[in-house]
């Protein structure tokens, strides 16, 4: 990026600084409608990071942990597919940023025609080894168009990693059939429990990690983001509020070894309810959603005719 291009980018993003970590500011960008770091990484820097470093060095234990969590993930994904099947008019699904491919696997087991796009070569190999279709590379509508159109497109834990979330979701939207569904899942950052811990209980904003996350959505900004892209909102929900462990005194930030234990307890709680009492799980989720708390949020939207 030359100096002129950098100046144009800086002038395009403006808003109050809401956090500063590792020489990066997070601004509540009035142009974009969501929080993001400033300055942004270049596209080349991101490609290098996610094609190799992300799984090979930054998250070398990723696949081992994913396999350990697989049963829990498949229960969550059953919940997601039941929601999609209540609204979808067809069963062709594209998962952008498909990671280890468990969402694809869950869909294929239910008779969906599924395809993933994934920037990590290692994750693609891991997915293909189980007989699932995945394209290696950063998603573009041009590359995906030969496989489309799609009835559902999933963007799960992706928007926080990309330079241009608006451009990405506009490209995804162009591949949806009229009335198609966009599923958006992202970390619920700067949520009320996090803000209490930061502003009142002496914690730093630990969720701000500029090397991994460029953008910081919460439930409300995620909903606005989808509405601004001309999606009719069909459903929103949040997930288990992991920050409740911190408020209860289990400081997994200062003691990382507690983190896996807390995660295991979350899995046990959710798995029992997803498997045996999904109505009760939905009731808990509705309460968390109403308060804007929960570690992740989900927005499901329908594309209009235009």
Which residue stretches match the model-derived regions?
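Short glycine-dipeptide loop
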Residues: 176-182
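Short, glycine-/aromatic-enriched active-site segment of Class I SAM-dependent methyltransferases
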Residues: 185-215, 220-225, 250-251
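Conserved catalytic loop of SAM-dependent methyltransferase domains
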Residues: 234-265
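Short, conserved SAM-binding segment of the class I
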Residues: 167-172, 221, 225
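Conserved N-terminal segment of class I S-adenosyl-L-methionine
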Residues: 1-156, 165-171, 238, 259-274, ...
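A SAM-dependent methyltransferase catalytic signature shared across enzymes that methylate proteins
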Residues: 219-239, 274-275
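Short catalytic micro-motifs in class I SAM-dependent methyltransferases
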Residues: 156-163, 185
């Amino acid at each position: 990026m030359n100096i002129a291009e950098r100046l144009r980018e800086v002038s395009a993003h403006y808003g109050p600084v809401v956090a500063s970590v590792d020489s990066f500011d997070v601004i509540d960008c009035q142009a974009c409608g969501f929080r993001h770091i400033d300055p942004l990484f270049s596209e080349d820097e991101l490609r290098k990071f996610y094609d190799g470093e992300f799984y090979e060095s930054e998250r070398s234990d990723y696949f081992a942990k994913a396999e350990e969590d697989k049963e829990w993930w498949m229960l969550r994904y059953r919940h997601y597919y039941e929601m999609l099947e209540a609204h979808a008019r067809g069963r062709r699904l594209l998962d952008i940023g498909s990671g280890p491919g468990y969402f694809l696997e869950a869909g294929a087991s239910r008779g969906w025609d599924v395809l993933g796009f994934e920037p990590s070569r290692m994750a693609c190999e891991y997915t293909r080894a189980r007989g699932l279709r995945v394209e290696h590379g950063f998603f573009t509508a041009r590359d995906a168009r030969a496989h489309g159109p799609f009835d559902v497109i999933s963007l799960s834990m992706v928007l926080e990693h990309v330079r241009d979330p608006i451009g990405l979701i506009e490209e995804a939207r162009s591949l949806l059939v009229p009335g198609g569904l966009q599923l958006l899942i992202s970390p619920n950052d700067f949520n009320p429990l996090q803000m209490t811990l930061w502003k009142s209980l002496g914690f730093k904003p630990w969720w701000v990690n500029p090397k991994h996350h460029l953008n910081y959505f919460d439930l409300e900004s995620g909903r606005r983001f989808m509405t601004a892209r001309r999606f009719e909102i069909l459903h929103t929900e949040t997930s288990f509020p992991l920050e409740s462990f911190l408020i209860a005194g289990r400081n997994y930030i200062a003691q990382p070894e507690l983190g896996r234990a807390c995660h295991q307890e979350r899995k046990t709680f959710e798995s029992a309810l997803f498997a045996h009492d999904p109505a009760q799980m939905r009731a808990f989720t509705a309460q968390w959603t109403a308060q804007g708390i929960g570690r992740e949020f989900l927005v499901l939207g329908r594309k209009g005719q235009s």
